[in-house]
Regions:
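N-terminal alpha/beta PP-like core and its mobile active-site loop of ThDP/TPP-dependent enzymes
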Residues: 5-189
Length: 189
């Protein structure tokens, strides 16, 4: 008997995968992630690159400060990834510090699709433009942005602009958040 089951080791989100691939090609070596569901496609995309040093930090504020330290030490941006809602807001203190010290940093916040925002749902907050006062550049990537040229340009612009301080990308991700793979499901006798 065959069935389709969720494969939690892959992502079908082209946007998450393409942004990470482009940053790795630009020279990304460090990333910091915090546990969450909405950011799973980003975490899976990062994990698919064995050359990356990935640090897991349970607290988003701490995660952003670890990424800030990586940028200070290496002189290159580290990527810090958070799930949606108030978790994303916790990147703020490190982003402000990176802004004033001109430390390279890329903050990527996962978000609900635009049509599922502002409904009073859990883990929802206005994330687009959240850090505009303290970033060199910010961008909202819509949930169905799959044009490779556009995604490459967003990633390259973020990388370039982050050389003199933090940038913020708010990436809308719809469900399912994990990839789908066809696998064999054994029949129990």
């Amino acid at each position: 008997v065959s069935d389709y089951l969720c494969d939690m080791s892959t992502t079908d989100h082209i946007s998450a995968d393409r942004l990470i691939r482009t940053w790795v090609a630009c020279g990304l070596t460090h990333a910091v992630v915090s546990p969450g569901s909405r950011n799973a496609p980003l975490v899976l995309a990062l994990a698919s690159h064995p050359s990356l040093e990935i640090v897991v930090a349970l607290d988003e504020r701490s995660a952003a400060h670890v990424a800030l330290g990586m940028g200070l030490q290496s002189g290159r941006p580290a990527v810090v990834v958070s799930t949606s809602g108030t978790a994303a807001v916790n990147h703020g203190p490190a982003i402000a510090e990176a802004f004033y010290q001109e430390v390279p940093l890329i903050s990527v916040t996962a978000d609900r699709p635009s049509e599922k925002r502002d409904w009073g749902l859990g883990q929802s907050a206005m994330q687009n433009g959240l850090f505009e006062a303290h970033t060199r550049w910010s961008c909202e990537v819509p949930e169905h942005q799959n044009d490779m040229n556009t995604l490459d340009e967003i990633a390259r612009t973020a990388w370039r602009k982050s050389q003199r301080g933090p940038v913020h990308i708010n990436l809308s991700l719809d469900e399912p958040l994990y990839g789908k793979s066809k696998i064999e499901v054994p029949v129990l006798a």
